[in-house]
UniProtKB/Swiss-Prot annotation:
SUPFAM superfamilies per the UniProt record, alphabetical: EF-G C-terminal domain-like (SSF54980), P-loop containing nucleoside triphosphate hydrolases (SSF52540), Ribosomal protein S5 domain 2-like (SSF54211), Translation proteins (SSF50447)
Gene designation: fusA
GO cellular component, one term: cytoplasm
Domain of life: Bacteria
Gene Ontology terms: biological process: ribosome disassembly
Domain tr-type G: 8-283
HAMAP family reported in the protein's UniProt record: EF_G_EF_2_B
Keyword terms of this UniProt record: Cytoplasm, Elongation factor, GTP-binding, Nucleotide-binding, Protein biosynthesis
Gene Ontology MF annotations: GTP binding; GTPase activity; guanosine tetraphosphate binding; translation elongation factor activity
Biological function: Catalyzes the GTP-dependent ribosomal translocation step during translation elongation. During this step, the ribosome changes from the pre-translocational (PRE) to the post-translocational (POST) state as the newly formed A-site-bound peptidyl-tRNA and P-site-bound deacylated tRNA move to the P and E sites, respectively. Catalyzes the coordinated movement of the two tRNA molecules, the mRNA and conformational changes in the ribosome.
Localization of this protein: Cytoplasm
Protein name stated in the entry: Elongation factor G
Family that this chain belongs to: Belongs to the TRAFAC class translation factor GTPase superfamily. Classic translation factor GTPase family. EF-G/EF-2 subfamily.
Residue numbers binding GTP: 17-24, 81-85, 135-138
Amino acid sequence: MPRVHAIEDYRNFGIMAHIDAGKTTTTERILFYTGKSHKIGEVHEGAATMDWMTQEQERGITITSAATTAFWNGKRLNIIDTPGHVDFTIEVERSLRVLDGAVCVLDSNQGVEPQTETVWRQGDKYKVPRIVFANKMDKTGADFFKCLQDIVDRLGAKPVAIQLPIGSENNFKGVIDLVRMKAVVWNDESLGAKFEDAEIPAELLDQAKEYREKMIEAAVELDDDAMSAYLEGNEPDEATLKRLIRKAVLTGAFYPVLCGSAFKNKGVQPLLDAVVDYLPSPLDVPAIKGTDDKGNEVVRKADDKEPLSLLAFKIMDDPFVGTITFCRIYSGVLLSGTGVVNSTREKKERIGRMLLMHANNREDIKEAYAGDIVALAGLKEARTGDTLCDPANPVILEKMEFPEPVIEIAIEPKSKADQEKLGVALAKLAAEDPSFRVSTDLESGQTILKGMGELHLDIKVDILKRTYKVDANIGAPQVAFRERITKKAEVDYTHKKQTGGTGQFAAVSFVVEPNEPGGGYVFESKIVGGAVPKEYIPGVEKGIESVLSSGVVAGFPVVDVKVTLVDGKYHDVDSSALAFEIASRAAFREALQKGKSVLLEPIMKVEVVTPEDYTGSVIGDLNSRRGQIQGQDMRGNANVINAMVPLMNMFGYVNNLRSMSQGRANFTMQFDHYAEAPANVSAEVQKKFA
């Protein structure tokens, strides 16, 4: 069956926002008005179509990015719903990677919030073209113009209003479309399905003219002919204006801002028009680059005639179909039943069932084309970030980067049956989410779960208990400390065992020095003249690496260290890779002691938004948690306090803050950097763990 929609008619986009800005509600309305959803799901009733895991429906936050296909004005929309909670930034990062464009939703009452900044920065990183939707215009305190100023102040971006609100709070009636210079007013009785063009209210006409002029001036800057015509007194027509706004979105010259209230069903259809008019098709964004099997850079254009390449960006466990792998097809055509190669893992796979997902309804399809986002059932080897491609034209597309977890908990199954279920469940959860790690504590034998924050791990434990029916005891959250050396150390070590039987002999000389922060572990061999034969070097590395996972201060992983093998000795008969491994292990441990290893702790960037009455208490409390106040700011009538606080002092903070502010303050926190722990903290940790 040939392609139904031309690739230039595709819009692969996501909706990004701070938690509670109304992102899921906006997505719901899009599905409702595009005819894909027969009933509007409300988040606060726990019934939203996109939020399809039980955990999401209860918490009213979106955790997993479900991909949905819908249609508007003859264009095919592939919508990826992204989570807005900071513990799930990995999901956002992953979906931004496969999107061509995004709608950034703001709460008009709050403006740009901490998580908006985070997702905006991630959007900048992947160069995602964006439009902005100022939502919740019906809310008390909604202020469209403050949102515009916030985008300048907090995101450092250039916003251009292409709509203005008609009224606000309870009197929010509709919007002024500055491109067409028309008012668009919604009929409250029709659930927002009916709306009509009207003349702009007289009292808003001057304001509309002023903002239209600003919009035109920003647009004509992108085109010399349009600029010349404008300077001669000729305004661009509607088609030219739309073309220039589209150009601005694609180049990031400015960001068009629209407004509405998804909850009150106002402003959603013009937002859909803007998605179609201004966001890119797969042909408008740069072709994806990758490397072939010889390591050469290759480009895959968004074209059905190109060799097949697709990227797995999400893996989910579906109760009906089993494992589902969400993929973005970048080039070529994918047919059900064909063989592909997972070039990242060098494994072959066969494509079985192919599904088009609509939130949690699914439609079986037999073929998919460049630009499509599809769900593949039953892939055995695929993990998030893997490339699948045509075996005759192997390619590995750009890798995704995943952050290191900063918090961990121990989990102990209550019975042998639970132990078996736990193993299967954790393997699936780790495959679905690369920021969730599972390891075994070698000394205690306990299973350790590592994640990005308390909520992240809470939800994983919840899934284990509900979905996989694992009954287990959960330990208190622990901080993921690290260790690093602070000065250069030189060591010589000889391992000798020559009593009876085959002997063991190996001598190594190391120079061990601190690497720059974030530089990781680096090994270099400067052996000349065969002082350590080549075949024993892997043994040397293995010995060092066995110590990296548990350092000498309190048994935590060693980071940012450079080890240089400068000399050594071997014995023709008694030396072996194992002997060099043993020697290197002991030498490296000695070097860590000599190099004055210290304990590093994760420092979190904390932002507290509180009514002014509680500012003193909040600051006093943060100081008592070893927090360093970075600054204060007013946002509306609330005080915003920014601080750097060690993670170990932030456990249970949510309840403390709630009682301190009578539930009126809230906070967000994300990992910022590792820093050396003070001596008293280090001693306390050593006593507990060493």
